[in-house]
C-alpha cells in the first residue's frame, strides 16, 4: 500500500520492475515545459518535419500536442522512461559490399516489431506500479494498449495534494517525508514511439542519455542503439538528473551524412534525411538527394555508425532483435519485383511495412542506380514502364545513371 512507502521507495520499485521486465535503462523525468520543447515548435515552424503531419497534431485550441504534456495529459506528474538495447553483433549493413544488395537500418532487422516488444514490457512495469499502490480491493483495468489509452484507479498514496501543486516551472520535487491521506486517482498511459510527446526530451531528463549532435539519445555505456518507451503517470516520483552532454567538439555524425541533413549540431532537416526519405516520404524523392542515398532501402544508420560512443556498444541479449534471415542486406531485384502478397507475407510484424510496397520498390530502384552495376539496366528498363508511375520515374533515372557512369 502506497501510504506505507516513501516516494523514493516507489521510484526504486518502478526502476527495479523495469530491469526485471528486460529494460537495460530506466529513469524518471518530471513534467515540465523544457526548453527543448520550445525548440521543437521552431523545428516544426521551419518545415523540418517534412510531410510527417502527425508531428503537427494540434489540440482544440490550436496548440501542438507534442509541445507540452499539459495539452494531452494534464494529469501527468512524472514520466517513466525505459530503454532497450537493440544492437546486435552483426556488422553495419553498409559494410555489405555486394552491389546487388541493399542496406536496411539496424532497428528494422528484428524478428518482431519493436513497438510490440517494448510495449509488452512497459505493461509489466505499469502492472507492478499498480500492484504497489492500489488499495486492497481496487483493481485497475487491464494495462494500456498500444494506442496509449489511459488507465485510472482511485488510491490513497504518493502524490496527493503535492501532485497538484504546479508552479510556473512545473511540478515541485516530491518529498520522501510526504504522506498523502486524501484519495487521488492513479492514471497511467504507455507510449512506444507513437504518442503525442517528444520522447527523447524526457529520456534526457530521466538520465537515460544525452541528446547527441545527430539528435539521437546517447548513453555512455550502451551508445545510441536504444528503443524508448514511456509511462505517463499521475504520481509524482523522484526525478533523475539529466544526462550531461558528452559530444564535446566531435562532429563526425554531421560530417558523415551523405545528404547533408544536419543544418547544424542537434538540428536535423528531415527533408534531407535518408531515413525520412526511405520510410516516411511518399511519392518522388528529389533528384538532388537520390545519389546520396547510396543503396539504402529502409532507414539509415550512418550518423550512428560513425559515433565514437558506439564503437564498443554492448550487444543486446534480447532474441527478438536478432536479424531475420535476408533482412540485413536484401537483394535489390527481389525487393523491386516483390508482389503485394509477397510484401505482406515477408514483412508481417516488421517495421519495414511502414514504407509500404510502393516506397520500398522505389527505394530499391534508386539503390540499383547507385550500385554502379550495369547488370541492373535491363531490369530498370522493364520498371521504366511499371504501372506505379513513381517507381517508373525513379527507374528511368536509375537506368540513365548507370548507362552514363
Label every model-predicted segment:
Residues 357, 387-389:
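Short inter-helical turns and helix N-cap capping residues of alpha-solenoid HEAT/ARM repeat scaffolds
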Residues 342-346, 373-384, 404-405:
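Amphipathic alpha-helical scaffolding segments comprising HEAT/armadillo-like alpha-solenoid repeats
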Residues 2-135, 184-246, 294:
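Auxiliary alpha/beta "docking" domains used to position bulky ligands
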Residues 361-371, 393-402:
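Structural detector for internal amphipathic alpha-helices that build alpha-solenoid repeat scaffolds
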Residues 276-294, 305-338:
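A beta-strand-loop signature enriched in Asp, Gly, Thr, and Trp
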Residues 324-358, 365:
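Alpha-helical adaptor scaffolds
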Residues 23, 252-276, 296-320, 379:
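Iron-sulfur cluster-binding cysteine motifs and their immediate structural context
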Residues 1-8, 16, 62, 127, ...:
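Intrinsic disorder/low-complexity segments
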Amino acid at each position: 500500500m502506497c501510504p506505507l512507502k516513501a516516494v523514493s521507495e516507489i521510484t526504486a520499485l518502478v526502476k527495479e520492475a523495469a530491469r526485471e521486465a528486460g529494460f537495460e535503462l530506466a529513469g524518471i523525468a518530471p513534467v515540465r515545459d523544457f526548453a527543448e520543447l520550445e525548440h521543437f515548435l521552431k523545428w516544426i515552424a521551419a518545415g523540418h518535419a517534412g510531410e510527417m503531419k502527425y508531428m503537427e497534431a494540434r489540440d482544440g485550441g490550436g496548440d501542438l500536442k507534442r509541445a507540452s504534456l499539459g495539452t494531452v495529459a494534464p494529469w501527468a506528474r512524472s514520466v517513466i522512461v525505459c530503454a532497450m538495447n537493440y544492437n546486435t553483433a552483426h556488422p553495419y549493413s553498409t559494410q555489405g559490399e555486394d552491389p546487388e544488395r541493399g542496406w536496411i537500418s539496424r532497428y528494422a532487422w528484428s524478428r518482431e516489431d519493436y513497438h510490440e516488444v517494448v510495449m509488452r514490457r512497459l505493461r509489466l512495469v505499469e502492472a507492478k506500479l499498480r500492484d504497489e499502490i492500489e488499495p486492497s480491493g481496487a483493481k485497475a483495468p487491464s494495462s494500456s494498449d498500444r494506442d496509449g489509452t489511459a488507465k485510472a484507479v482511485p488510491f490513497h498514496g504518493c502524490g496527493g495534494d503535492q501532485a497538484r501543486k504546479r508552479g510556473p516551472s512545473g511540478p515541485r520535487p516530491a518529498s520522501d517525508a510526504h504522506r498523502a491521506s486524501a484519495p487521488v486517482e492513479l492514471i497511467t498511459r504507455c507510449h512506444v514511439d507513437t504518442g503525442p510527446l517528444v520522447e527523447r526530451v524526457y529520456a534526457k531528463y530521466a538520465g537515460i542519455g544525452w541528446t547527441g549532435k545527430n539528435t539521437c539519445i546517447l548513453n555512455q555505456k550502451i551508445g545510441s542503439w536504444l528503443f524508448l518507451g514511456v509511462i505517463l503517470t499521475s504520481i509524482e516520483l523522484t526525478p533523475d538528473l539529466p544526462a550531461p552532454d558528452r559530444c564535446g567538439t566531435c562532429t563526425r555524425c554531421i560530417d558523415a551524412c551523405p545528404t547533408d541533413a544536419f543544418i547544424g549540431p542537434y538540428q536535423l532537416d528531415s527533408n534531407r534525411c535518408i531515413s525520412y526519405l526511405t520510410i516516411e516520404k511518399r511519392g518522388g524523392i528529389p533528384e538532388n538527394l537520390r545519389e546520396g542515398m547510396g543503396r539504402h532501402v529502409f532507414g539509415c544508420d550512418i550518423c550512428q555508425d560513425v559515433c565514437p560512443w558506439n564503437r564498443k556498444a554492448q550487444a543486446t541479449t534480447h532474441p527478438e532483435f536478432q536479424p531475420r534471415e535476408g533482412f540485413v542486406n536484401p537483394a535489390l531485384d527481389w525487393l523491386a519485383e516483390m508482389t503485394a502478397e509477397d510484401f505482406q507475407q515477408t514483412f508481417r510484424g516488421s517495421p519495414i511495412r511502414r514504407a509500404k510496397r510502393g516506397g520500398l520498390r522505389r527505394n530499391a530502384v534508386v539503390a540499383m542506380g547507385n550500385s554502379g552495376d550495369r547488370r541492373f539496366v535491363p531490369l530498370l528498363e522493364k520498371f521504366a514502364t511499371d504501372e506505379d508511375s513513381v517507381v517508373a520515374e525513379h527507374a528511368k533515372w536509375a537506368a540513365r545513371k548507370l548507362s552514363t557512369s
